[in-house]
Amino acid sequence: MLDLKRIRTDFDTVAAKLKNRGVSEDTLTHLKELDEKRRALLVQSEELKAERNIASAAIAQAKRQKEDATQQIADMQKVSADIKTIDNQLVAIDQQVTDIITVLPNTPHDSVPVGADEEDNVEIRRWGTPRDFDFEVKAHWDLGEDLDILDWERGAKVTGARFLFYKNLGARLERALYNFMLDEHIKEGYQEIITPYMVNHDSMFGTGQYPKFKEDTFELADTNFVLIPTAEVPLTNYYRGEILDGKELPIYFTAMSPSFRSEAGSAGRDTRGLIRLHQFHKVEMVKFAKPEESYQELEKMTANAENILQKLGLPYRVISLCTGDMGFSAAKTYDLEVWIPAQNTYREISSCSNTEDFQARRAQIRYRDEADGKVKLLHTLNGSGLAVGRTVAAILENYQNEDGSVTIPEVLRPYMGGETVISPK
């Protein structure tokens, strides 16, 4: 959530930054006007309360002296009625302010490219060279069926579209991947966490999914619970409402969890395969950092995600998302896109973001600065390290062989009992 004081004191800068994110200046102007009206009403309310206190003292004095206090009582009743009217106006204005400010996206960092959509994203670097196949490559969904490791038909029967069963060495490959990813992150200083897979509405607000993106989630009817769309939500909210010791920062968390997405608005997109599912495993990284260190931590987090892809030998590129393509809470985002041979293109497999104090303000996560003793908002960061299903897809396609088998990357073999290849039965 944005700082209302910042909007008030640096309106033009905030308006210009949010314009690049599709926010109308009229919206901010209306918010500023509401804030000014609210502040004026607060002054009036305080003045009237001071009058009421004076009137109350005068009434008490008159009663002690056995004097008629009828007029003073009438005056105080009028003042009290005026205060109630103003308080009701303040409640209404506060709600209007909340309705606007809670759906405003974060302001982009100055280094973020300005653009309308993914066409304006900027490639930063590439790693690895896509393999030159001397046979016709298969898509991962066909490989999965031919190898008897992915069962789409029964997934659809048991649940519905965009669900599947992993089986045999497919299930083992998925498990090997997330154990490998977690082990690599732990080596980099991340604390492993097993989170709840359901959170409450306050947690969804804290990380920015609510109220704006409710339609993208699975809520449990007649409860305060939501299935997590990413482990970012419980990991970030772990410290919601707390004040941390500045000496403990930065703090690194990692977790593997299922992620549940309704994929509202994605009809017709990636209807086959592992790219877009309602339920998938993802290894998440979350950091809590001091503001002056958060962009250095973003580079480190991105490198942690890249490390996984490099050790798996998967070609990828790093993209800096433009203002029009970034997520709601992000101030800056790097996407990692892995090479998918059957599609002859790179597809997102990780997204690493610095939200600065946007989530921390919503969730009230603060730290006490050891230098001056003041309590301040910290910065939160989050990143995929990696999306496991998409990594399975990338391995199946990049490591496929002409005979229909798939070679298992060397780093995963210890996690798969020494298996070296997945072969057709």
Swiss-Prot record:
GO molecular function ontology, one term from the record: catalytic activity, acting on a protein
GO cellular component: cytoplasm
Keywords: Aminoacyl-tRNA synthetase, ATP-binding, Cytoplasm, Ligase, Nucleotide-binding, Protein biosynthesis
Pfam families: Seryl_tRNA_N (PF02403), tRNA-synt_2b (PF00587)
Superkingdom: Bacteria
PROSITE patterns reported for this sequence: AA_TRNA_LIGASE_II
Residues reported to bind ATP: R261, S262, E263, E348, I349, S350, S351
Pathway terms, separated by semicolons: Aminoacyl-tRNA biosynthesis; selenocysteinyl-tRNA(Sec) biosynthesis; L-seryl-tRNA(Sec) from L-serine and tRNA(Sec): step 1/1
GO biological process: selenocysteine biosynthetic process; seryl-tRNA aminoacylation
Cysteine disulfide partners in this protein: none
Catalytic activity: tRNA(Ser) + L-serine + ATP = L-seryl-tRNA(Ser) + AMP + diphosphate + H(+); tRNA(Sec) + L-serine + ATP = L-seryl-tRNA(Sec) + AMP + diphosphate + H(+)
Keyword Calcium tagged: no
Subcellular location(s) per record: Cytoplasm
Annotated EC: 6.1.1.11
Subunit structure: Homodimer. The tRNA molecule binds across the dimer.
Protein's name according to its UniProt entry: Serine--tRNA ligase
Protein species of origin: Streptococcus pyogenes serotype M1
Gene name tied to this protein: serS
